[in-house]
Structures are given as structure tokens and as C-alpha cells.
Regions:
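The conserved 3'-phosphoadenosine-5'-phosphosulfate
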Residues: 387-404
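Glycine-rich phosphate/pyrophosphate-binding loop and the adjoining helix
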Residues: 404-416
Length: 472
């Protein structure tokens, strides 16, 4: 009979990316013990350059500027760039983990195989790699949703190399090749630009038109301008009019002038595509825009407009499957239709000890939003333990269907898998902050807010034995 280690006084946090770290930190502030299970060898998720499971390429940069990506109680150093690249993002997250003592609670190179709840018990049995089982008082799922590649299927066969953008790291495999990028999201645009600077020829196949935002408007980060405009509380049609005007004045105007498809939806009804150089490369002829693929023909590709191109490498920048939970039965996630039905995408309507952090898609500012989710979670768990009467209102709230106004402020995103989890970040952020205020409780011993990041904080501590072994 398999022995089950008793950790019923603790929470199991699955994942040590930005969401998992925020979850662990907030739980620990309320004296709730945690084990953070991470399948890679360090914290940081996709931003950890040594993570073999990362889907990020070496040149990747955040599309959110410093003021809107940092955790509220852990400012990004002033000497970091406006848009963090992979190394700075990793340094920031690892510094956060060190400052709040999260490394001591993390178990690296471990995998959660299965999570189950046995009949009659509110606790969770977590099975780890090697068959080890533990009983936890609660579980926080923070494994992210950009790790299960989605690849299209086309008629015909292709004789060259096919890869998904999740496999792409550097432009080395593209040098001297004729490259076709499929997909017009941020990653597809970034890789297309790198290809244009290294490959013999670069083609970009885009099925659906979209609006392309530069990283700067009027000399300021685009998200800073966007936030300021929305504070004017203008009607949505007026915001769209201003947005189109900003794009025409500050970037390159209409995408169709560069051979790209015309957007078939209104401005703001999509996940933002932010890239300052794609249209420049298109305008200089180093990238050729193409419509959707009609057929693969050996070393050539036929497009829906009847044109053909000789191609050596195809890179599918076609996103990820958004609803992958391979370690827990869907019945535990209140699954209905295409996705789990969780209050504000995080809180189970029935279970008081199962939470999902980071299960949303937003155009900007997702790290602090994960932190707000974690703040609500930790406060709720704390109130359940010390003041059940004050916790009841949130138990009732999370059992009710969330309204569109709480998620997207009335914006109707066009139907696409990438939008299944899409929220309008300002509206969603306000909804979370409102709940935090209503909780009316702060950690007994609030974490010290650092004014700077000493150099020692940026050094990654040596990884030691597992947290459970350390507790033994």
C-alpha cells in the first residue's frame, strides 16, 4: 500500500512562474505553508532561459512596460529597460522569489502527475513523479497556458523543415533559407522580423487581419498612453476613433497598404499585436505578406490567392491550446463547454480549496493581475480559518456566474480560441481590486516593500533538496 505523506496543513502550488510565485508569496504572508512544485530546475516559467519546457525564444521581450508588469509591492529596478527581455524578466522573478523566501518552499525538477479528491474528504491527494503521494489541504494550479502548441493542418505534404514557434530559439536555423511564418500574433511578427534579418527570403501568411500597435506612442510606452486615454472615461466608439488616429499618426496606418488583410473586426476586439518593426520590414520588402495556405506542394506552398512560393522552412506561430489540465479530472474544474467555469477565471464555485491563478488572457499587465488573484485567494482562505462569517459573502459571490462587465467592460472579442480566456485588463483589474478592498483584511506581517534590488538579490541561490525533505 502506497504511503501518503500528510501535508494537510499546507497548499500545493503547481508551477513556479509569475503566477505560482505570487500565489506562494501571498499564502505565506498569511502563515499558510506551501510546497511549490516546478518541473523545471528554477523559477521563472517561460522566462527561465534554462527551462527545457519554455516556449520563449531568446530575443523575446515583454509587450507590457515596467509600470504595468511589476508586482505592486516589488518594483522593477530603475536601471532595467522599459520593456524587459528574457534575462531581465527572469532576474526580476528570481529576485522576487528570493526576497520573499520562496526558494525554500520550491521543489524543482518535480512533476505533478495527478490530483484527485477522494469521496468524503475535502483534502486533495497529489501524486508526484515516481509515484510519491501527498495529502494537501488545498491546491493552487498555476501551470500557465502557453505550453501546448496548436498546429494547423493543410492538404498536401511538405519536404522541408516544419517547426512550431515554441521550438524556435534563435534565427540560426533560418539563415540562408526561404522561410514561411504562419500566424500574425506577437510571436509570429517577432520571428518574422528576425527571419527578415537572417533568411534569404521571408513570407508571412496571415489568415485574419488585425491592428498593429507600436511599443511607443508620442514618445511614451503604448500601454501608458492607453491607460491615460481610458481614464478620460470616453465612450468606447470615441476611444476606437482616437485609437485609429493614434495608429495612423504614430505607426504606419492601414495594414492593407502593406499587403496584410484588412481587419474584419473593430479596434480593441482582439488581443493586441504589439510590434514596432514588422511594418517597417514589410515596407522595405524584406517580408512578403501572403494569405492563408491552400496546399503544401513538396518544396513549394500554394496560397489561397493562387500565388506560390518556394519554401525551405515553415514556422507555425499559431498559438497554444488554452485548456490543457493534464493532471486533474475536468469534473473538478466545473467544466462547461470549451472551458472551466470559474468565478473571475480563478475561483471554483463550490470548492473552497482549489484555485487557478493566471488562467486568463490579457493584452498587457498580467503579472500584477495574477498577484491580485492571489491576494483574493489568500485572504479568503485566511477568513475561512479565522472569521467564517466574513468569508461567507465571497463564498456566495463565487458561486454565481460572472458577468461580462466584470471581465471585459462590454467589449465583444471575435470568436477565436485565443479569446476564450480574454479579459479587458483594466476592467478585470478593477474587479479584482474591488474584491480585495471588500475583503478588508491585510496580512498579519506585511512583507517589507524593497526600495531597490541589491545585487545579491539578483543572484540565483543554489538549488537544494526538496522542501519536504528539508522539513523532515
Amino acid at each position: 500500500m502506497t504511503t501518503i505523506a500528510d501535508r494537510s496543513d499546507a497548499y500545493c502550488v503547481v508551477g513556479a512562474g509569475a503566477g505560482g510565485l505570487a500565489a506562494a508569496k501571498n499564502l505565506m504572508e498569511f502563515g499558510i505553508d506551501v510546497d511549490v512544485i516546478e518541473r523545471a530546475g528554477d523559477v521563472g516559467g517561460n522566462w527561465n532561459g534554462d527551462n527545457p519546457f519554455s516556449a520563449a525564444y531568446d530575443s523575446i521581450h515583454l509587450i507590457t512596460s515596467k509600470p504595468y508588469i511589476q508586482y505592486d509591492d516589488f518594483p522593477i529596478p530603475d536601471d532595467y529597460p522599459t520593456y524587459l527581455g528574457r534575462s531581465h524578466a527572469y532576474q526580476y522573478l528570481s529576485s522576487y522569489a528570493r526576497r520573499f523566501g520562496l526558494y525554500e518552499h520550491a521543489e524543482f525538477n518535480r512533476t505533478v502527475e495527478w490530483i484527485e479528491r477522494r469521496d468524503g474528504s475535502p483534502e486533495w491527494i497529489v501524486t508526484l513523479d515516481g509515484g510519491e503521494k501527498r495529502r494537501y489541504g488545498g491546491v493552487v494550479i498555476a501551470h500557465g497556458h502557453n505550453w501546448a502548441p496548436r498546429c494547423p493542418s493543410y492538404p498536401g505534404t511538405f519536404n522541408g523543415v516544419i517547426m512550431h514557434s515554441s521550438e524556435y530559439r534563435t534565427p540560426a536555423p533560418l539563415r540562408g533559407k526561404r522561410v514561411l511564418l504562419v500566424g500574425g500574433g506577437t510571436s509570429g511578427c517577432d520571428i518574422a522580423v528576425e527571419s527578415a534579418q537572417n533568411a534569404t527570403a521571408t513570407f508571412l501568411s496571415i489568415r485574419r487581419g488585425c491592428y498593429y500597435w507600436p511599443k511607443y506612442l508620442f514618445g511614451m510606452p503604448t500601454d501608458v498612453v492607453y491607460e491615460r486615454v481610458l481614464k478620460w472615461r470616453m465612450p468606447r466608439p470615441v476611444v476606437r476613433t482616437f485609437g485609429k488616429l493614434f495608429l495612423r499618426l504614430n505607426s504606419a496606418g492601414q495594414p492593407e497598404r502593406y499587403g496584410l488583410p484588412k481587419p474584419g473586426h473593430k479596434l480593441l476586439e482582439e488581443h493586441f499585436v504589439i510590434n514596432s518593426t514588422l511594418l517597417y520590414e514589410l515596407g522595405h520588402g524584406r517580408i512578403a505578406a501572403k494569405p492563408d495556405i491552400a496546399e503544401l506542394r513538396g518544396d513549394r506552398v500554394l496560397f489561397t490567392d493562387g500565388s506560390e512560393a518556394e519554401v525551405d522552412v515553415i514556422v507555425y506561430a499559431t498559438g497554444y491550446r488554452m485548456t490543457e489540465f493534464p493532471f486533474i479530472d475536468r469534473k473538478h474544474l466545473n467544466w462547461t463547454g470549451r472551458t472551466p467555469q470559474l468565478y473571475l477565471n480563478a475561483f471554483h464555485p463550490v470548492y473552497d480549496n482549489l484555485f487557478v491563478i493566471g488562467y486568463f488572457q490579457t493584452s498587457t499587465g498580467n503579472w500584477p493581475i495574477m498577484d491580485y488573484q492571489a491576494k483574493i485567494m489568500s485572504r479568503y482562505i485566511h477568513l475561512l480559518r479565522v472569521d467564517l462569517k466574513r468569508a461567507i459573502w465571497f463564498r456566495r459571490a463565487k458561486a454565481t456566474p460572472v458577468t461580462a462587465a466584470q471581465l471585459n467592460g462590454g467589449i465583444k472579442y471575435y470568436d477565436s480560441e485565443r479569446h476564450w480566456l480574454q479579459v479587458e485588463h483594466i476592467t478585470y483589474r478593477k474587479s479584482l481590486r474591488k474584491l480585495i478592498r471588500r475583503m478588508g483584511v491585510e496580512p498579519p506581517a506585511p512583507a517589507e516593500v524593497p526600495g531597490s534590488h541589491p545585487a545579491a538579490d539578483l543572484a540565483v541561490p543554489a538549488q537544494s533538496s526538496s522542501a519536504v525533505a528539508a522539513k523532515a
